Amino acid sequence: MTKLNLKTVLAMAAGSLLLASCGSERSPVTGWAYNDPQNGGFEKVPYEEQETGPGLVLIEGGTFTFGRTEQDVTYDWNNVPRRVTVSSFYMDETEVSNFSYLEYLYWTNRVFGPSYPEVYVKALPDTLVWREKLAYNEPYVEYYLRHPAYRDYPVVGVNWLQANDFCAWRTDRVNEFILIREGLLEHVPTATETDYFSTESYLAGKWGGQLKQKLPSFDEQAPERDVRMEDGIFLPKYRLPTEAEWEFAAYGLIGNTIGERITDRRIYPWNGHGVRNPDEKYIGQILANFVRGNGDYMGTAGWLNDNADVTAPVYSYWPNDYGLYHMAGNVSEWVMDVYRPLTSEDADEFRPFRGNVFQTQKRDSTDGTILVNDDVPVFQKFKHKVAKPVGNNGGNVGTVEEEVEDSILVSIPGRVMWRDVSIAFPTDNLDERRNYKSADYIGEKDGDVNSSIYFEQGEDAYTNKSGKLMYEYAKSSLVNDVAHVYKGGSWRDRAYWMNPGTRRYLDQRQSLAYLGFRCAMTRVGSPVGLGSK
């Protein structure tokens, strides 16, 4: 996204049309002039660097020790230390608040509610996560999400799928605002499911909303054009951070560097082994929202040390050296990765991540155009089998299988449709590729056939979905291909979980009263911003 005002860019482009033949920049490989209608109109647009999106902080990447920096007191052995490198990226300054999520719910209900209320229902957090069998938490069930007293508190009860849907919505709303701000798009506050703005649909030429004006083109055959990815105007997608990104950002080791040396490693997002502020002005104050000990969630009346019985406002306590709040306590946070115990050992040492399912846009079989869902929301039945032993003698007397079904929202009207890459589609060229041969690599090295005891069974083993052989849900493990990692401590956790290297996991359809999320965004181009060396 260019930092130049787009109106200035439009004026420069219009002037270039008149002065194209006078001193235009030329290609270093062909010698032809850029931005010249007489040469076909190939454009080189003015560009400085990526604009920082709303709510984001630039996290300058680098190398660090990914995994355990504290004793493995739970003996999970699931975070073996390993040196990796994380590219620069952006991350939300705070956790997503109740008020921000209510903005999303309001928009979803306004756009889809009249025709497709199920889309709105799917976005609703589970407020019943507050209930406990032997505690009176009904006030949180009734008031926490919607009462203005909690508007600046982190949203909870959101599952992994809902967090991803929020990221997709946020991407479209931010890019829509950019086009309106620059005078290219009509502001239509009454958009419906047929004409709301979608970044992917717009770039695919399938969006049917109201444009205010187009960009001038140097192509004599088409004097005006839509915004393209090559213009650098649109921001990259908001998304969940990867586990490595989250952990890297949480430590904030940029504050402990002298030259290229990291002087001190950290157990928490701050220096030292304690959880109290050593600064003379704030000495003794708790640095994060967590449980200090048995039954002590907030301190003593008259001196509430952490000033929070459950969650705390997203802008509270002290930020780490990247300027990020609550990277230790308050609520744990979803990350993008699928859980496996040995991911830190198996994943690549550059931008490690487990969870790849490679996809491509669906296209019309006749003309190859990108397909957009212009019909109704598409729900996909989500199934896995739970095996329960039969009998009480402890012997192997068979199993009873229950089919557990749930539906996930995979497509809504107005969005580009996607599919997994497949050998069945010659255009995917999987038989010619060297870096991947299929779509699903969630179980690579840990859960696929090659890493299982069924490897010697040959072709029969491949009839089972990846991850279902080694990890048989509820029979031998709670780990499967839809168990995702969440990081950090929370208002319900002891100090051990505030170490960024610790990790836990949960089914992507489940949620907790102490689990929230924050968004991230890819940094394109230089890993440092303007003004940095």
Regions found by a protein language model. Name each.
Residues 2-10:
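Bacterial N-terminal signal peptides that target proteins for export
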Residues 19-21:
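C-terminal motif of bacterial Sec signal peptides marking the signal peptidase cleavage site
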Residues 25-36, 58-59, 65, 70, ...:
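Functional-site microenvironments in short loops/helix caps that host divalent-cation chemistry
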Residues 30-58:
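Post-signal peptide N-terminal segment of mature Sec-exported envelope proteins
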Residues 44-46, 76-79, 473, 503-508:
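Short, P/G- and charge-enriched loop/turn segments at secondary-structure junctions
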Residues 47, 80-81, 303-304, 313-315, ...:
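Short Gly/Pro-enriched turn/cap motifs at secondary-structure boundaries
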Residues 48-138, 151-174, 329, 516-517, ...:
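A short glycine-rich, aromatic-capped structural motif
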Residues 512-531:
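Short, structured beta-strand segments at or near domain termini in extracellular proteins/domains
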